[in-house]
Amino acid sequence: MFMPDSIQLHLLQPGQRATITRINGASALRRRFIEMGIVKGETILIERNAPLGDPVEYFIKGYHLALRKEEAAQIDVILHEGANG
């Protein structure tokens, strides 16, 4: 189910903060996300892009992680108000 204000994580820019609303994709990928702490309701901060734009570094639950844009496209989020860096 698509939430009206939700967007895919890979569309956000460094400095933006969002709340995870849905995890899509194959069950193996969803399981991997859960193991990394990427779950519905968590806040995630977009830290920075790699020099060529992929992967992107995120900050969640007190640690940094990098996801490829194709992986981040499977995560729906709601952008926080005033979340531009």
Q: Would you name each region that the model predicts?
A:
Residues L9, F33-G37:
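Short, surface-exposed secondary-structure edge patches
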Residues G53, E57-G85:
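C-terminal structural segments of small proteins and small subunits
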Residues M1-Q13, H80-G85:
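C-terminal regulatory/oligomerization modules of transcriptional regulators
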Residues D5, A28-R32:
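Short alpha-helix capping/helix-loop boundary micro-motifs
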Residues R22-A26:
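A structural micro-motif recognizing beta-strand termini
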